[in-house]
């Protein structure tokens, strides 16, 4: 089992075995992104050790610029001191841009493996999670859409597509017409046009569809004004158990990056088949961690579609095909999928799953520190402050080392 609350203490303890007097910055409370939310772990060093900035709870966006600028100004105003950005995305266009701008080192891991392993560990014992072979299907799909503004305004387009295809009545759909953080969809949906180069005609058509829907669309929390954050729990378990397909609407969608959160693990814990609305190629990213998906039952080429609207529409096509199937056929399909559902469930709950990512994190941190070592005020590497033998370190770690 893993305890996410001591995650940064574990990282700091490991860093002290790699380099002398490391400094580690993390953000608290969970999900914070501002410099004022930084918490520090450090030794009484001489100011030459690398600074590791743990910006791994949230995706890297343009709005991170000010936070990173303040980190740079405080710890390396002259650019002499190494700063390493521990993050949770790969193949990221925006990350590469900011690494170059601030001259930060890169270190990545899949943070939400650790978070989800902690948050969802108790669901192994939840009697409400029914074996897939014994479920009675009443709804064809389920989807949760709490934050619907800013970069997640694509969820408004998705719900509009569901309604356009007469699919809402066939599923359990949760959608914030008034986003808890960004206000009413009538404002945020217009921002899609300029921010993401989506045609005005299409966006306005989606708004017209949304205007015709009777809100609220809720699965649970029907008596609250706003849908509360449920990242750390499985919400609406009875409704999940009577739904065939889980439509995961991820945090990142428009960007070019590999980035997933705890959301992708919810159907895995619940042993539900799923489709993924996220960045292009993120289903492939998930499979790289050993999970199986559902290309034996439907076309998963949607994952490769670069155009965001076409990707939404391809997923809606899968939902529509499923909605055309009778419940008894879906129950039989679920039984036929059970080996995949059990495989994913067992992988997630295996000790090896978290251990493998922890090993990856240690390797990535070691590589980053070797590439961005302690430096003197003039910028000269101080290699005797490294506690690892460069002679026994893989060659790819040694890029950037000069004496």
PLM features per residue range, with description:
Residues 1-234, 239-248, 254-403:
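Pol beta-like nucleotidyltransferase catalytic core
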């Amino acid at each position: 089992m893993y305890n996410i609350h001591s995650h940064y203490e574990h990282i700091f303890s490991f860093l002290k075995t790699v380099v002398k007097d490391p400094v580690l910055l993390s953000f608290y409370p969970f999900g914070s992104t501002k410099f004022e939310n930084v918490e520090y772990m450090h030794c009484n060093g001489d100011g030459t050790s690398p600074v590791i900035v743990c910006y791994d709870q949230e995706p890297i966006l343009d709005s991170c610029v000010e936070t990173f600028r303040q980190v740079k100004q405080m710890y390396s105003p002259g650019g002499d001191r190494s700063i390493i950005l521990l993050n949770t995305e790969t193949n990221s266009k925006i990350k590469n841009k900011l690494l170059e701008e601030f001259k930060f080192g890169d270190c990545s891991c899949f943070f939400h493996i650790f978070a989800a392993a902690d948050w969802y560990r108790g669901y192994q014992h939840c009697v409400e999670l029914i074996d897939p072979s014994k479920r009675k299907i009443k709804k064809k799909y389920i989807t949760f859409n709490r934050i619907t503004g800013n970069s997640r305004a694509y969820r408004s387009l998705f719900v509009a597509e569901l309604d356009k295809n007469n699919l809402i009545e066939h599923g359990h759909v949760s959608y914030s017409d008034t986003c808890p953080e960004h206000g009413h969809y009538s404002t945020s949906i217009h921002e899609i046009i300029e921010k993401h180069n989506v045609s005005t005609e299409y966006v306005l058509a989606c708004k017209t569809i949304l205007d015709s829907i009777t809100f609220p669309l809720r699965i649970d929390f029907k008596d609250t004004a706003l849908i509360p954050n449920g990242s750390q729990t499985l919400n609406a378990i009875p409704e999940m158990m009577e739904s065939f397909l889980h439509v995961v609407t991820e945090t990142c969608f428009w960007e070019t990056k590999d980035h997933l959160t705890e959301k992708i693990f919810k159907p895995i814990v619940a042993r539900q088949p799923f489709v993924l609305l996220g960045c292009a190629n993120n289903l492939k990213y998930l499979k790289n961690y050993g999970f199986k998906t559902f290309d034996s039952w439907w076309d998963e080429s949607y994952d490769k579609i670069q155009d965001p609207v076409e990707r939404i529409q391809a997923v809606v096509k899968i939902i529509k095909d499923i909605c055309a199937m009778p419940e008894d056929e879906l129950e039989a399909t679920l039984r036929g999928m059970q080996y995949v559902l059990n495989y994913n469930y067992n992988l997630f709950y295996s000790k090896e799953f978290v251990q493998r990512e922890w090993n990856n994190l240690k390797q990535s941190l070691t590589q980053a520190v070797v590439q961005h070592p302690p430096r003197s005020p003039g910028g000269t590497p101080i290699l005797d402050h490294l506690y690892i033998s460069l002679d026994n370190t893989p060659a790819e770690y040694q890029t950037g080392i000069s004496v």
